[in-house]
Amino acid sequence: MATRMKSSPEESHSADNGAEAPSISKKAQQTRERILQAARDVVMEGGAGHLTLDAVVARAGMSKGAFLYHFETKRDLLLTMIDDQVSAFDGGQEERELPFVGDPDPWLSSQVSAMPDGGMQKMSAALLAAVAEDPTLLEPVRGWYRRQYENASKSPRGTDIAGIVLFALDGVFLAEMMGFPTFAAEDLSRLMHTLQALARGELELTPIDKR
């Protein structure tokens, strides 16, 4: 991970005066989150092209030196932002599955209900644009997709149905993320209900010759 949890000059001074290590770690974590939020704000407001170290430093209201204690380069910052994005998708999976306990595949059912909101989609689009300068930054995202489709291949609903659900969700997500026009909100909502019914086993795909 690119992030370095080093203590800033101010934190080092506190340590010299007998401050406990946990408080230093907490302060470093708070500073890290402050930087990441500043970077998110810059991207959300101006797009990936405006994501520069100077812009983030100014937005965070700190010195360049303090920033560099946590992120040495723009690549380090981007990698951490992407890792956090992946963690946001993965985090709380067990909790998201709770409403679907008893379904054939609670994991698959939860994927439909966990579609990211507009803010996360815009952030993802901006980050994808940013990593165009360094494709290796997409490795955490590739790893996440790999896990998703490994789960789908083992779904109790079957690979075909799980694959249809995931491919549809990916299509909706990527289209909206890139700002491509698709369905009206009402039609999209109906589509999501259909996908959810398919995931939960309330709707089945029956070949014509077996109807």
Protein language model features and the residues they cover:
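Generic hydrophobic, amphipathic alpha-helix propensity
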Residues: 28-42, 56, 81, 85, ...
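Hydrophobic alpha-helical connector segments
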Residues: 87-125, 192
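Hydrophobic/aromatic-rich alpha-helical bundle segments in the mid-to-C-terminal region
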Residues: 135-142, 146-211
